UniProtKB/Swiss-Prot annotation:
Record key words, sorted: Cell outer membrane, Ion transport, Membrane, Porin, Signal, Transmembrane, Transmembrane beta strand, Transport
Signal peptide: 1-20
GO molecular function list: porin activity
Name by which UniProt lists this protein: Outer membrane protein P2
Taxonomic lineage from the root: Bacteria, Pseudomonadati, Pseudomonadota, Gammaproteobacteria, Pasteurellales
Length: 359
């Protein structure tokens, strides 16, 4: 019998967790190890970076390792600790092709109850993560973090007591602060202060509904960023992300419309507004083979100043060779026109073939 798209999406989303190895299970305590190794071979060209010709690369694409420990207290109460690492070095640095330094991507603890919800503390995803429906493996054309941060140093609450419905709220705290020494390795009199341009604090609320072939999600966030060293004023970002979709289960097809709006309030400079709309689809071509794509139109404007319009399209095909082995081909093209006295047009295009091995 043909799998429903809902089952495929859930399976893909939880692939690494489903393949994790249980290394300890005793007296209500469960410890799992898992992750994936991901490689992509690509060709890319960008007038934004003044490239004269296409560049090819074979590099890391989101390889990760995680450890999760869960302890069940009884009566539905539990505690969980989670740590996930990533490779973070850029391909242009140290010739690493993104296989350089290893850092902690997520690290948090959770206290919860199946009926009352859970509280999460640490570096984690927020309720804004996963709001949009567009599928991508590498070249996603949606910049959700420009509207609402999707992760950070947070205290969050999530409620999943109603089938298909998730409610959540997050408070974001500062994460990136000045070190004891500056870039010249001299004592830094700003040590401990939030870095300019980084998150100072923020709040988010959101709701996600995914049941009965209907997908509806929305999140709102207000985030304050450090403005400068001269005063205590902040740069405030107010943003909304939303998606609305419908699954034609018999056809294995999901159609969706993602959208977002944000306004950045600057203390002494002009305010900035941005919005985007993005129709997309995901289609089960055959068992274990899926086709997906989306188009985006985004507009950014500064009060009585620069205006930017971007049109982008993404298309991809993935095939599961084994429950722990996924291959895909994906391409994206973006065209950006900036108007500020004159007109400047920039183009970016990328295509890649990737392989993921889960463990």
């Amino acid at each position: 019998m043909k799998k429903t798209l809902a089952a495929l999406i859930v399976g893909a989303f939880a692939a690494s967790a489903a393949n994790a190895a249980v290394v300890y299970n005793n007296e209500g305590t469960n410890v799992e190890l898992g992750g994936r190794l991901s490689i992509i071979a690509e060709q890319s060209n960008s007038t934004v970076d003044n490239q004269k010709q296409q560049h090819g690369a074979l590099r890391n694409q989101g390889s990760r390792f995680h450890i999760k420990a869960t302890h069940n207290f009884g009566d539905g109460f539990y505690a969980q600790g989670y740590l996930e690492t990533r490779f973070v070095t850029k391909a242009s640095e140290n010739g690493s092709d993104n296989f350089g330094d290893i850092t902690s991507k997520y690290a948090y603890v959770t206290l919860g109850n199946k009926a009352f919800g859970e509280v999460k503390l640490g570096r984690a995803k927020t309720i804004a993560d996963g709001i949009t429906s567009a599928e991508d493996k590498e070249y996603g054309v949606l910049n959700n973090s420009d509207y609402i941060p999707t992760s950070g140093n947070t205290v969050g609450y999530t409620f999943k007591g109603i089938d298909g419905l998730v409610l959540g709220a997050n408070y974001l705290l500062a994460q990136k602060r000045e070190g004891a020494k500056n870039t010249n390795k001299q004592p830094n009199d700003k040590a401990g202060e939030v870095r300019i341009g980084e998150i100072n604090n923020g709040i988010q609320v959101g709701a996600k509904y995914d049941a009965n072939d209907i997908v509806a999600k929305i999140a709102y966030g207000r985030t304050n960023y450090k403005y400068n060293e001269a005063d205590e004023h902040t740069q405030q970002l107010n943003g909304v992300l939303a998606t609305l979709g419908y699954r034609f289960s018999d056809l294995g097809l999901l159609v969706s419309l993602d959208s977002g709006y944000a306004k950045t309030k600057n203390y002494k400079t002009k305010h900035e507004k941005r919005y985007f709309v993005s129709p997309g689809f995901q289609y089960e071509l055959m068992e274990d083979t899926n086709v997906y794509g989306n188009f985006k139109y985004e507009r950014t404007s500064v009060d009585q100043g620069e205006k930017t319009r971007e049109q982008a399209v993404l298309f991809g095909v993935d095939h599961k060779l084994h429950k722990q082995l996924l291959t895909y081909i994906e391409g994206a093209y973006a065209r950006t026109k900036t108007t500020n006295g004159g007109v400047k047009t920039e183009k970016e295009k990328s295509v890649g073939v990737g392989l993921r091995v889960y463990f």
